[in-house]
């Protein structure tokens, strides 16, 4: 029971006091159910308002997608697990910062949240935990913060409308990603880290893009993209129409001029000619 000392010191006069809120710690309850909560001011007489308090199972977390995001925050992520439904004030805690969460069913219990800013410009992993009442939290997953990437060079910077061009993007802060993507204008394609070179990403040019310059950006989690503003030019497939001369000695050394149709070769970035399996440098004139 609880006691309060109210009024004057000697009882000669009294002052009416009104209590508007009580704080207490919920007791253990073996069954997962809703119970009525009443209060008493004298250990005997209880209210009869039948306010409801729900006992819930402890949440269990399985996956977080994406599992990385920008240090600037705003990454939308989903937490999949069990016993995530029915919270009165569901929150997700990343390190020491909490954000509101909303429950949805996506093949199972799922909580949606938005990652808060990290507050420092560094790559780091933080613990992720969930509380259905904004007080008790349980966790077990990690979320990685990365520094926003920057693209400094695109090679080659042109490609055929047929697609398939292997494009190398050079820059900085490409490490710490979970879902690598390249974006040509509004079109996304998968990307991968170039072997042991952490400042190089590789991606294939998608087919049938409009024949026009398009901004090329990268993402480390499939959501937030760089804003470097470098351009990639898509061109029509060149069709050779004539060779002059069309023959030469086996020793090589013949200067060959090729006429083409269907493409503006002046926008090219890397000019090459291939004789059977032999590739040689070429110049545009």
Pin down the residues of each PLM region.
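Ligand-recognition surfaces built from glycine- and aromatic
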Residues: 2-29
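Conserved Ser/Thr-centered positions that define the repeating blades of beta-propeller domains
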Residues: 38-40, 129-131, 219
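A generic structural motif
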Residues: 77, 108-116, 169-170, 198-206, ...
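Beta-strand/beta-sandwich contexts
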Residues: 30-31, 36, 44-88, 134-178, ...
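Surface-exposed, short loops/turns at beta-strand junctions within beta-sandwich domains
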Residues: 29-33, 116-123, 207-212
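Short, surface-exposed loop motifs enriched in S/T, G, D/E and P with embedded aromatic residues
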Residues: 50, 97-105, 139-140, 187-195, ...
